[in-house]
Amino acid sequence: MDLSESLHDFILVFLGSGLILGSLGVVFFTNTIFSAFSLGLVLVCVSLFYILSNSHFVAASQLLIYVGAINVLIIFAVMFMNGSEYDQNFRVWTVGDGITLMVCTSIFISQINTILDTSWHGIIWTTRPNQILEQDLISTSQQIGIHLSTDFFLPFELISIILLVALIGAIFVARQ
């Protein structure tokens, strides 16, 4: 996207905030439905990051595969589960939880140190869409990606909608 630098930075901070809040919601919500919806927010924010960096095909794939299929399946699975199983076996803290907390905290601190120690001034964040020419592409998978995101985008989207409707219909029929 050809945006001014200040608008690009504002959108980047907004998406980062949505990503952080959504991931905190995934971890801290006690209701699994709310946690699954927070996961959907995280996946949509990641897809919008791809759009911001001019990777439209990857963004469309992210939306279709992860948000449109995986997250919907997670929500359906949570809806079909019996919630009383979890209430009976609830424990506050175990030794494994403490070890996991220490490992995750150390990984988080090391990632923060890596981010702060990295020089970000020489990195080119985006490419212009007109810089990619079809004859310059190395592999056929890149050519397929270009054609799916330009010439065949509408059929690709229609097939994904048909598959989603078929999945919802199969779950509805199986439930009855």
Curated annotation (Swiss-Prot):
InterPro entries in UniProt: NAD(P)H-Q_Oxidoreduct_6 (IPR050290), NADH_UbQ/plastoQ_OxRdtase_su6 (IPR001457), Nuo/plastoQ_OxRdtase_6_NuoJ (IPR042106)
Superkingdom to which the source organism belongs: Eukaryota
Enzyme class: translocase
Pfam families hit by this protein: Oxidored_q3 (PF00499)
Membrane topology: Multi-pass membrane protein
Catalytic reaction list: a plastoquinone + NADH + (n+1) H(+)(in) = a plastoquinol + NAD(+) + n H(+)(out); a plastoquinone + NADPH + (n+1) H(+)(in) = a plastoquinol + NADP(+) + n H(+)(out)
Compartment list: Plastid, Chloroplast thylakoid membrane
Protein's UniProt keywords contain Cytoplasm: no
Keywords for the protein's UniProt record, in alphabetical order: Chloroplast, Membrane, NAD, NADP, Plastid, Plastoquinone, Quinone, Thylakoid, Translocase, Transmembrane, Transmembrane helix, Transport
Record-annotated membrane-spanning stretches: 10-30, 32-52, 63-83, 92-112, 152-172
Gene3D superfamilies, sorted: NADH-ubiquinone/plastoquinone oxidoreductase chain 6, subunit NuoJ
Example GO molecular function: quinone binding
Entry EC number(s): 7.1.1.-
GO cellular component, one term: chloroplast thylakoid membrane
Job of this protein: NDH shuttles electrons from NAD(P)H:plastoquinone, via FMN and iron-sulfur (Fe-S) centers, to quinones in the photosynthetic chain and possibly in a chloroplast respiratory chain. The immediate electron acceptor for the enzyme in this species is believed to be plastoquinone. Couples the redox reaction to proton translocation, and thus conserves the redox energy in a proton gradient.
Subunit structure: NDH is composed of at least 16 different subunits, 5 of which are encoded in the nucleus.
Similarity comment text for this entry: Belongs to the complex I subunit 6 family.
Protein name: NAD(P)H-quinone oxidoreductase subunit 6, chloroplastic
Species this protein is from: Phaseolus vulgaris
The organism's taxonomic lineage, starting at the top: Eukaryota, Viridiplantae, Streptophyta, Embryophyta, Tracheophyta
Gene designation per UniProt: ndhG
